[in-house]
Amino acid sequence: YRGPSNVLWRVGEGAWDSKKITDSLKALPTYGPLRPAGVTPADPQEAVAMMADGTSVSLRMEGVRWARPYRSDTLQGPTPRKVTDVVQTGQQIWVRQVGDAWWLAQVPDVNSALVSINPQNGAVMALVGGFDFNQSKFNRATQALRQVGSNIKPFLYTAAMDKGLTLASILNDVPIS
């Protein structure tokens, strides 16, 4: 977990009133199921988070247990033992509903693309160009200028096998004139 998106107010500086919290949250976008929220009170067992519409939701330990602190690409901190190890009063966080419960969430730092093709007829079954169109209008599946790298090998090898080539086949790799 990379931490809160913002600190709305610090404990000891005077808490914001409900209108100020909701006005701040209404200015933020939603990303798919992720909703911005402001942590009002937080204690070791539970944090209450106010949503942009003024409703409050409860974050319990099962909804924050996953949020080990991010240290580096290869290292995470310890598993939290209480809710306040993860969130504090005054922080702006992201939450999502899981069943009847609300869980802490975060907007991903990375995006990727996916093109799913039906191998029977070559039809495109799904094409995903990123995490959320409202976050980034750039479609990584159709607009990226990167080379496909090894992702294309299964298609090339399958086509070669369909033509009768094997792993032992020798091909003369000279320019065609």
Protein language model regions, located:
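Extended, non-catalytic substrate-recognition/exosite surfaces adjacent to catalytic cores, especially
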Residues: 1-177
